[in-house]
Amino acid sequence: MNNIFVSATNHGFDALAYLDGLPVDRVHQVHLAGHSQGRDLLIDTHDSPVCDEVWALYENAMARLGPVATMIERDGNVPPLKELLRELWIARKLGAHAQQVPQDTRIAEAA
């Protein structure tokens, strides 16, 4: 999700439109991460918390995809366990919404 957000921001395309174009039946895992602000662009560094915009994109993805495996990546600046568990709680909370949306609806919306 962060890669989509970073690329969309840096290259000026719509992240939700990109997400709409993904083949729902081929997505089996979603990765969440943070990024850093470079001089002129965002850098997908996986060394900061997941930002609000990426959480919103993730929530949208879960509504479209349904429950899929989700990994929170933190390759640097690893915070205390309490902060990681907070991100896990957010991911689970947002992902729970996907279980309330019938699969036929998700596929129809993605088509």
Residue ranges and their predicted role:
Residues 15-22, 49-64:
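A short, acidic, amphipathic alpha-helical segment used as a generic capping/interface helix at domain edges
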Residues 26-28, 65-68:
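Short, well-ordered coil/turn segments that N-cap beta-strands
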Residues 81-107:
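C-terminal helical cap(s) of enzyme catalytic domains, especially alpha/beta-barrels
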